[in-house]
Amino acid sequence: MKTAYVVDAGVAVKWYLPEIHSGHALRLLRKRFDLQAPELIQAEFGNILWKKCRAGEFEGTTAGEILDSFMRSPLRVHPHRAILSLAWGIAMKHRQTFYDSLYLALAMTEKARMVTADRKFYDALAGTPAERHLFWIEEVP
């Protein structure tokens, strides 16, 4: 049975764009883990590409190709409905965005670990019981 990891959009975008920690993110793909995310990742990933296009980092056609490639990635996408209440509780308890809390709620539900490149989110949950469901991107085995 493959080890399951929930990845956020900040990790997934590093599969396609050379950024800090891209090597760590790519290891997730190369080792063929069971990669999962809430369906929100598709919108967040597209928005990251849109922002980079607006900033002039690359053309829209390139972003479209990256988005197409992402949609073919070995990422198992889950609907939100079953994790909404848990995500809300996480967001309120830890004062984190509902968006980020959806990823953590999925990790908890799937008995997986969430891999994040969002330092602020990771640090906010350090020292809490939720930390056992988190991996900082540099901790990827």
Model-derived features: positions:
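Acidic, PIN/NYN-like endoribonuclease modules and their adjacent C-terminal/linker elements
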Residues: 1-4, 104-141
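Short, well-structured N-terminal submotif of metal-dependent ribonuclease cores
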Residues: 1-41, 52-65, 120
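Residue-level signal for well-ordered alpha-helical positions
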Residues: 19, 28, 48, 90, ...
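Phosphate- and divalent-cation-binding pockets in alpha/beta enzyme and binding domains
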Residues: 24, 44, 86, 123-124
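Short, conserved alpha-helical segments within structured domains
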Residues: 41-42, 62, 83, 103
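Active-site-proximal, substrate-binding regions of enzyme catalytic domains
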Residues: 46-78, 86
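Active-site neighborhoods of divalent-metal-dependent phosphate/nucleic-acid chemistry enzymes
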Residues: 75-117
